[in-house]
Amino acid sequence: MNQETTWFGQPRGLTVLFLTNMWEQFSYFGMRALLVYYMTKQLLIGQAQSSFIYGTYTAMAYFTPIVGGVIADRYLGKRKAVIIGASIMALGHFMMAFEALFFFALAAIALGNGLFLPSLPSQVGDLYKRDDPRRGWAFNIYYVGINIGGFLAPLICGTLGELYGWHYGFGAAGIGMVAGLIIYLAGQKHLPPEQPRRPAANDQAREGFNRHTILLLLGVGLSVTVFRAAYEQIGNTVALWADSGVDRAAGTFQIPMTWFQSLNPLFVMLLTPPLLAYWRRHAHKETQGSLVRRMALGSLIVGSAYLLLAAVTATTGEALAGWVWLALFFLVLTFGELFILPTGLGLFARLAPPHLGATTVASWFLVIFSGSLTAGLVGTLWSSFEPSGYFLLLAAFAAVAALLLRGISSVADPETKG
């Protein structure tokens, strides 16, 4: 393993994984920024059905990694799984340029994602020894890569799709996926060696796991499922509100509706460095319990962001809300997100046995699957509520998740169980 350090004092392989992930996320967020608008404005699918399709697609994109992680660990290996998965996803993104292939394209992206998604972040963990303190910070750096791609995608894919034609936006997303694949192939020598594949050994499957660890992961997973029912609305019903309920005029310029999807990843990039610096100074106090408490605080902050939207929509009534309120919402939501999502992914990777890295990370994506599916169902309620009441409901979901996580944190450390 190449231990030469570069950016942020991390192994060179992290740069390869960071850039690969960045371009994959560019393709994902580029397509996501267009998806609900494409269905309602181009395919003329109703709002409730479009929200459900959106939620089902995002859910399936995170369900397939459950199987894909097992396939990567037992049969293909992580590198081959990433290459095959990225190739299938690129094909799916290009298929999105053709209306007749819409549902086939969504299926291809979800299937390719199943191989790609658990295999790439689990290689981040493989770059380090299990007791290396840089391991946890690496996932926050990796998370910035997600959000650089997420920031650029709505500006490029969204602008092309909204102003020049939906299919140009989808095509740009496909090009991003190809760029990520090329970077991954070119950087193979810097990646961690493959862990030995150990098919079907039940005793090995149990190695490294105990009852306390399993219950901890289940409890955190359930809590994050509830949280994501609210969080995932940023690309669904919040995006619809940005189109219909927000005054997007900035002087004489009309801000494209897809551009607001760039605010979340932009704020991630701005807020991550100071938060990382703070957490690094307090790393010596870090325990499993403190990580779960951090997640609880994050969920509470996200709930306050939705409370802000509830107050704004209740105050404005039928009038359009100023776009500054939407920007402030994304700032508060993103601050809370950084406390919960990268921390949760890092916790799952931290507790994973070495030979089950992709499988354990895949279980984190099972959490995202269940949360996205719940979010799709919650999204169908948008037309049945006043915006203020709907955003209040989302705040309640985030608050419940915070309470669950706070309760779990008290028994999260092995020495405190029982």
How would you name each of these model-derived features?
Residues 55-72, 117, 262-275:
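Central cavity-lining transmembrane alpha-helices of secondary-active solute carriers
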Residues 33-49, 234-260:
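Short amphipathic helix-loop junctions that connect adjacent transmembrane helices
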Residues 61, 134-162, 169-180, 184, ...:
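Glycine-rich segments within core transmembrane alpha-helices of 12-TM secondary carriers
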Residues 84-104, 297-318:
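C-terminal ends and interior cores of transmembrane alpha-helices
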Residues 65-97:
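Conserved MFS/SLC helix-loop-helix module at the cytosolic interface between two early adjacent transmembrane helices
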Residues 253-283, 298-306:
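Transmembrane alpha-helices of Major Facilitator/SLC transporters
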Residues 1-12, 129-133, 157-253, 275, ...:
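Intracellular loop-helix junctions on the cytosolic face of multi-pass helical membrane proteins
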Residues 22, 92, 101-116, 318-339:
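Hydrophobic core of transmembrane alpha-helices in multi-pass small-molecule transporters
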